[in-house]
Amino acid sequence: MRKGKTPIVFIPGLFGSMSNIIIPGTGNWSFGLSAFIYEPFIMMLESMGYERNKDLFICFYDWRQRIVFSTQKYLLQTIAYAKKITGCDKLNLICHSMGGLLGRSYVQSDEYKNDVNQLIILCTPNAESPPNYSYWTGGSLPIHASSKINIVHFYMEQYICYFSILHKMNKVEAIHIYFPGLQDVIPCKDYGNYLFIKSDSSITFLPYSKMKTKNPFLDILNTNRFIIQKRNIETTLIAGDGEETTQYLQVVPSHSKLKWTDGKVVGDLLTKHGDGNAVLHSIFLLEGNKYVLHASHNEVLYKSIPILQKIL
């Protein structure tokens, strides 16, 4: 163990944890199908001198559940365990993607125990990401931003199919019952208006305030985001850039009572100012030390190592 080094708790993103709780037969907690993404990153941290379960701890969690629930059940326990094993009263959180919302949910809460030195966020869309509207309200993403395979979208489509067949119900109904955490990752007020209707040559955006599909969890969390600085938690935000990323979704009126609450997704507008999953302005909603890397959502993990070597 590195003497004088602050212990790390790493929180992976959506689909970055797997166990019998999520899919029976998959065993104890692990990175599961995302091991090929996260294990190399953990090995890079180990090459910096950290040791797993000695001063490097992984917070696996049930990403199907609401973020507040996962924070209480999984993150608080992992932090308590890390403090007990190391004898340290402060640690650093390194969070990837959805994991950053768990980290924030803790450090911004009333239960915060003044035990986080640094909050390091990689690719977390702090105002979230438009494709999640499509999954939450329609059960699928009818459009694909790029010819490249998007791992997050691929896993999302497969998992939604799996549990809708398992529970013998339509996808949207199954999502709302068995994957409530997905509501916590649809765009919030701070993202801005993101659904638009096209008529002839004009584009009209649907105001977030008029939408039925909202993200109350993130709206509240972001209103209260300045408490992170007040609590003297050093914050670092690392984003990926240069990958085609969905910025807005084109919708048409839906006549279904079950699906597409605020419009059926039929198209999108892309930006290169993102990592393929998260746009820059969503990641950089928080105050902190900001870094932009020319990298995709997962490549940022590996390309961030020189930054982490400087700040840890």
PLM segments and residue spans:
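N-terminal non-catalytic accessory region
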Residues: 1-151, 272-312
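Intrinsic-disorder/low-complexity loop/linker signature
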Residues: 26, 55, 183, 191-193, ...
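Alpha-helix C-cap/termination motif
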Residues: 48-51, 85, 109, 178, ...
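Alpha-helical scaffold elements lining the catalytic groove of polysaccharide deacetylases
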Residues: 70-73, 78, 189-198, 211
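Extended catalytic-interface subdomain
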Residues: 125, 129-206
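C-terminal subdomain of alpha/beta-hydrolase-fold enzymes, centered on the catalytic histidine
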Residues: 205-312
